[in-house]
UniProtKB/Swiss-Prot annotation:
Comp. bias regions, Basic and acidic residues: 528-543
Compartmental location: Membrane
Segments of this protein annotated with the region Inactivation gate: 1-28
Protein's job: Voltage-gated potassium channel that opens in response to the voltage difference across the membrane, forming a potassium-selective channel through which potassium ions pass in accordance with their electrochemical gradient. The channel displays rapid activation and inactivation kinetics.
Organism (species): Rattus norvegicus (Rat)
Glycosylation sites: 257, 266
Record PTM Phosphoserine, positions in chain: 8-9, 15, 21
Bias (Gly residues) ranges: 77-86
Membrane topology listed for this record: Multi-pass membrane protein
Protein name: Voltage-gated potassium channel KCNC4
Catalytic activity: K(+)(in) = K(+)(out)
Binding annotation for K(+): 437-440
Chain segments annotated as transmembrane: 228-248, 279-299, 314-334, 346-365, 382-402, 453-473
Motif stretch (Selectivity filter): 437-442
Amino acid sequence: MISSVCVSSYRGRKSGNKPPSKTCLKEEMAKGEASEKIIINVGGTRHETYRSTLRTLPGTRLAWLADPDGGGRPESDGGGAGSSGSSGGGGGCEFFFDRHPGVFAYVLNYYRTGKLHCPADVCGPLFEEELTFWGIDETDVEPCCWMTYRQHRDAEEALDIFESPDGGGGGAGPGDEAGDDERELALQRLGPHEGGSGPGAGSGGCRGWQPRMWALFEDPYSSRAARVVAFASLFFILVSITTFCLETHEAFNIDRNVTEIHRVGNITSVRFRREVETEPILTYIEGVCVMWFTLEFLVRIVCCPDTLDFVKNLLNIIDFVAILPFYLEVGLSGLSSKAARDVLGFLRVVRFVRILRIFKLTRHFVGLRVLGHTLRASTNEFLLLIIFLALGVLIFATMIYYAERIGARPSDPRGNDHTDFKNIPIGFWWAVVTMTTLGYGDMYPKTWSGMLVGALCALAGVLTIAMPVPVIVNNFGMYYSLAMAKQKLPKKRKKHVPRPPQLESPIYCKSEETSPRDSTYSDTSPPAREEGMVERKRADSKQNGDANAVLSDEEGAGLTQPLASAPTPEERRALRRSGTRDRNKKAAACFLLSAGDYACADGSVQKEGSVEPKACVPVSHTCAL
């Protein structure tokens, strides 16, 4: 209502007896600005802005705060308030949110400027959760901050590679939570535990040893016995590789003359053949190593949680291929037929497969696993490097062929008698050696034009190789740092789950997304949510005129049910990899209820005095779910 001072000023201005009053205009504008202002207290930090600023992004949590009539607010699934009112004490209302105050400054600045930037001092998952709570899509992040925002996703994907059983290539490190997850999965797949009850209790005693044997040969950090087995396996691997190398040395080879007598009818023919045999001691050592590898392979394939995954693993295929030739050679050594000798000759050639056992060291050394992950992650860079080299080889091989023909003598019709570059395919070898800066010296240009092409080829090779290499080095550094951090991470058996908020406790409502989904729930942990989430009524006539804010989630009806069993490691990794849009497609609603509101049985909210107190319940500690 316009004050009396303003009315008299307006009449005086109309009659011409009194000039217009600027004080009146300033006073009315100040009153309008005061009613338009809103105060948002986030984690103890007060932010002041206009309601019109919050309305710039409709459908978000702050936009619902700025709408006192509830026109743009969706109704709650749980029968919550359909309309609301905000109490005013002559000034702007203040609403409290127990969220991160630093991130909210960037969120509020997004409402003001329309540009969402990512803070550099906040972890990526925390910023993602805050965006989910305030109802802002992650795709609104500015391009300049998108790489910073995506860094935590890349780190989580790299950690998932180390946690996966087939991607890690071996057991988990000390203090590694992924090892506990894998052992838990193994127990679930292999059947009941020993001493279990129920129909499967009889088979549980038989199969209870399988998880222990699997951990004994697969996870070197599961027990002291597993470490002994790991050292024994490492010892036999090194001995087998050493034996393989010594077999090719002349000092361990024995020449033997073999006499063969062939009789065809009445004709007898004698043939002398020379054979080279390996020192028997090396054969015995190799036999002992193969017996250990056979025992290890059989135990692992019998006790593995998933036989199909075991068969598809590359390291297990290498184990089988390296063991098989030894037994075939022993079985065919007593035969003297020509076919048997041919097979033995082939098996001796196939002995080089034993050198592939060196890859089994990846189960015991983190650096080798990191190298394997780096090679797989840098596939695009390697492909780009090959394409660059192929283009350079084709171009410079053609150029060197024609450049060398410039110095040909007139008596040379082909023009290639004075040079080694007889054709373009020969120039491919020279171009590869030159671009990789090896320079064997077997082929080199002899004319001034060929030398110029050779110099250009060497410079192009240096620049071509230097471009993709830093990306590969960065990938290795990222994987190695993550692996080292994962090993130094303290062991976490069970994560702490806080008690659920009680109806009369001063705990504020939170969205479903802030619940510890990734926690490992113990059997004694209480349900995460037994009743609706409650926000305490904030009554402060000096600050906000007795304003009350009650947070509600549109999907709160489903949250009133007790939580199910603890999520599996695969589910936790899937939740970690999911984005903001997948985690929460509908942002939680925030309804404003004044102290005089009554929640009725039909779901409506009516003012004090308009309904009978018996028909409705006062809204003081009620969450609109």
